[in-house]
Amino acid sequence: MTRPPKYGTIARLAKALPGVHETFYNGPWFKVGKKGFALYWQSTESWIFKLPQDQQMMLFDARPETFAPMRSGRILWSYVEVENLSTAELRDFLTSAWRTVAPKNLQSDLRMKGN
């Protein structure tokens, strides 16, 4: 497998969030418990983030060159063209995606750290 774009940066930022671990299924997945929030799908060579729905809809309209819808059953994920994002933007979007799956106690831990 070739290394996904910005893998090192994404792995570092994702693993800095409370409770995150990495697994592998057709590419790296970043999860809290059994719930994924960011993954690289090798067959489509795409990063996919689980962003909040209201944020997704805004991004699909405002930044279509970077964000596109990806539906899995009833769940809407976002294809993310990570090369178009700065490290600060990646951190913000990964944190937003993480919040969609992280339990409240872990979210409190992050708030206590000032994020």
Tell what function each PLM region has:
Residues M1-N115:
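Charge-dense, helix-prone N-terminal extensions
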